[in-house]
A protein has these predicted regions:
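GIY-YIG nuclease catalytic motif and its immediate N-terminal context
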Residues: 1-21
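Boundary/linker segments flanking structured domains
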Residues: 1, 20, 25-144
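Hydrophobic anchor at the beta1->P-loop junction of P-loop NTPases
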Residues: 155
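Conserved helicase/translocase motor-coupling segment
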Residues: 315-320, 329-478
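Hydrophobic positions on the alpha1 helix immediately C-terminal to the Walker A/P-loop
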Residues: 166, 170
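Signature of the SF2 helicase/ATPase Hel1-core->accessory helical subdomain module
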Residues: 252-337
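Conserved lysine of the Walker
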Residues: 163
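C-terminal accessory regions
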Residues: 303-305, 447-545
């Protein structure tokens, strides 16, 4: 049987064959004594596998709903296939609706699954490669802690392989291991139960652990999730500057989106430029321009775990490719690199991610064959108005359908809210009005997001406008970067501190990366509109019209 146990603020979900004994255990646990409302789900057709599946689904949905704080530990949610699972899942939908009618849930399933609380929740069923990586990471980390050896760990994966989920999941798991009062309810069915055994808690309980997220918007979203998750707190989610400024070192730093850490470059404000200098002086005794935010992370922690996709560098200030390659080489030499392969976001699978990266590669496309992706809506539009209308219909039906674009138009509406930024084919559009959590903001369906508001996030459908910053030369048969039509000032800024001038080929690689990120946001589909006629004609051979 499966049960929920809740009070006014908290909820716990469990599975047991002996409910009475299980309730006695809960009543004896101080952290659950305030839970006084019990609901038991009984079905004579439910076997052990079905009960574990229902338990894990309820945990995930309750975490995403946000009405209650979920008290379950993150010791490995089950997601195993079993006989007749599809039919049992239909019964789960009925159970959910009954629980919602009883006010256990506030929102419908579709709304929950579109929320950041759900998408960024640590309560996730891991893919096999994520689970293998997690187990290997934990085994190695605990060995390092036992022997008092510093360590560097690296997780690599393409867009949609769940790097951010691994970062969040691991942070929660380490905190749970460190704070678990007693292993009274750990089960052999739990994926990571062995790490809650005696000895591991003692290695972690006094350690300072934090999650580092370079992007402002994603960092704010994760902070909201951490604030509502027992064992975690918003102040555990830091910017690289907060790490550098800390007067106390960290024991473990988990760094998401490592490719967005900065080298020494002109920052967004004079205040941040001054901070860069101050941090270098504090940590290294000099303001050598070769120091990067990667160096800050290493200097400020004994153990580091980096999550990386080098093809998602999008600005000149991001760590250079050679620095990232050096990190990969040194970590691989120690046997501490873990790849993620399974595509969790895009229904087109890993082949789709590879395909869109190749058709927009700065290298001439000479060996690419047309591919279709059954079950995934991938379409090229000749008219932006038509694409916008289709996207609105998808948003009305499924939610989370958004327009995104390269930074090929100036942000006029930032100073004058009545001005339009993008005017094409009868469409009059403005850039995103908020830089934080734009995807879920009111009116987002009427706006256009940039790389800085969507990198790291999932959409159901993405309508991608490839602007005039990217063109195609049919004579040379290659992509061309149009500097005059690229309006991200920081995206094309030279680096006089390091004596670097970025030519058009350098920026073409970054702009190609940007569109590669935008084209891999949509879980169910991606619609494409291309401004440059030659590039549009070129892409017709690769994208269905």
């Amino acid at each position: 049987m499966v049960y929920t146990l809740n009070g006014s603020r908290d909820v716990y979900v469990g599975e047991s064959v002996n409910l009475a004994a299980r309730m006695r255990q809960h009543l004896a646990a101080p952290e659950k004594q305030h839970l006084d409302d019990v609901r038991v789900i009984l079905d004579e057709t439910f076997n052990k596998s079905v009960c574990l599946d229902l338990e894990s689904q309820l945990i995930r949905l309750l975490a995403g709903d946000g009405k209650y704080r979920v008290l379950n530990r993150n010791d490995g949610i089950t997601d195993s296939d079993y006989f007749d699972r599809a039919n049992y899942r239909d019964k789960f939908d009925e159970i959910f609706e009954e629980l919602r009618a009883a006010n256990v849930f506030e929102r419908p399933v579709a709304e929950i699954m579109n929320s950041d609380l759900f998408k960024l929740s640590p309560f996730k069923a891991l893919t096999p490669d994520q689970a293998i990586a997690m187990e290997d990471i934990l085994e190695g980390l605990f060995l390092d802690l036992e022997t008092d050896q510093p360590s560097t760990i690296l997780v690599q994966g393409d867009p949609g392989t769940g790097k951010t989920i691994v970062a969040i999941y691991l942070t929660k798991l380490l905190r749970d291991i460190a704070t678990i009062p007693a292993p009274e309810d750990l089960s052999g069915d739990s994926m990571f139960a062995e790490f809650f055994a005696e000895g591991h808690r003692e290695l972690l309980e006094d350690l300072r652990i934090a999650l580092v997220v370079p992007q402002q918007s994603l960092r704010a979203s994760i902070r909201q999730v951490f604030a509502r998750t027992p064992g975690l707190s918003a102040d555990m989610v830091l910017s690289p500057f907060q790490v550098g400024e800390s007067t106390d070192p960290f024991d473990i730093l988990i760094v998401d989106e490592t490719h967005r850490l900065n080298q020494r470059a002109n920052q967004a404000s004079g205040v941040l430029n001054a901070k860069f200098t101050e941090i270098n002086l504090q940590l290294f005794g000099s303001d050598d321009t070769s120091w990067t935010q990667l160096d800050w992370i290493i200097a400020q922690s004994r153990h580091q775990l980096f999550l990386l996709d080098s093809a998602q560098r999008v600005r000149p200030a991001d760590l250079p490719t050679e620095t990232l390659n050096g990190l990969v080489r040194s970590t691989k030499a120690k046997g501490r690199v873990y790849p993620l392969w399974s595509q969790m976001r895009v229904r087109g699978g890993a082949d789709y991610v590879d395909y869109v990266r190749r058709i927009l590669s700065p290298e001439p496309a000479v060996d690419i064959s047309y591919q279709e992706f059954p079950g995934y809506e991938f379409r090229l539009y000749d008219n932006l108005l038509d694409m916008c209308q289709q996207l609105r219909e998808k948003d009305a039906a499924d939610g989370l359908a958004r327009l995104v674009a390269g930074f090929a138009w100036p942000w006029r509406s930032k100073k004058n809210s009545k001005e339009y930024d993008i005017e094409l084919d009868g469409c009059h559009l403005q850039w995103n009005r908020t830089a934080v959590d734009w995807i879920n903001s009111r009116g987002a369906i009427d706006e256009v997001g940039s790389i800085h508001t969507v990198q790291g996030y999932d959409l159901n459908y993405a309508g991608v406008i490839i602007g005039p910053d990217l063109r195609y030369d049919p004579l040379q048969r290659k992509l061309i970067f149009d500097r005059a039509n690229y309006h991200d000032t920081k995206g094309k800024e030279n680096n006089p501190r390091l004596g670097i001038k970025y030519d058009d080929d350098d920026l073409l690689r970054l702009v190609s990366n940007i569109y590669g990120v935008l084209l891999t946001r949509g879980a169910r589909g991606t619609f494409v509109y291309v401004c440059d006629p030659d590039l549009r004609n070129h892409l017709r051979q690769f994208i269905p019209v």
